[in-house]
Swiss-Prot record:
<dbReference type="GO" id="GO:0005783">
    <property type="term" value="C:endoplasmic reticulum"/>
</dbReference>
<keyword id="KW-0963">Cytoplasm</keyword>
<protein>
    <recommendedName>
        <fullName>Uncharacterized protein C29A3.21</fullName>
    </recommendedName>
</protein>
<keyword id="KW-0256">Endoplasmic reticulum</keyword>
<dbReference type="GO" id="GO:0005737">
    <property type="term" value="C:cytoplasm"/>
</dbReference>
């Protein structure tokens, strides 16, 4: 049981860290004055996409899937975190392209 709780906490914290880095990144890009139309459009698309990713994760967090064994739950969390990281990387690539 302790092992299950540790894995659950680790996955929730990992997802939270990704979310925080994303929020900080958006703030930094805004502070740098990247106000071109393409960047603004991308930022709003990214926020919508990331929000959808968060919603996707929360559906699993608070659904009956928590009753599944920890192996299945770990797979769900891992895919959830990778989905968030993918959005995070897409944002950085687009932000770099805006500066070029």
């Amino acid at each position: 049981m302790l092992r299950y709780n540790f894995r659950y906490l680790h996955n929730v914290l990992s997802h939270t860290v990704v979310f925080c880095f994303t929020e900080v990144s958006l703030h930094i890009v805004k502070q740098l004055g990247v106000e071109s139309y393409a960047c603004t459009v991308h930022a709003s698309r990214f926020q919508k996409s990331y929000s959808a990713s968060i919603d996707y994760c929360q559906r699993f967090l608070f659904s009956s899937n928590l009753k599944h064994n920890y192996v299945n739950l770990n797979i769900i969390f891992t895919s959830c975190i990778f989905r968030s990281l993918r959005e995070f990387l897409r944002f950085y690539i687009a932000a770099i392209m805006c500066f070029l």
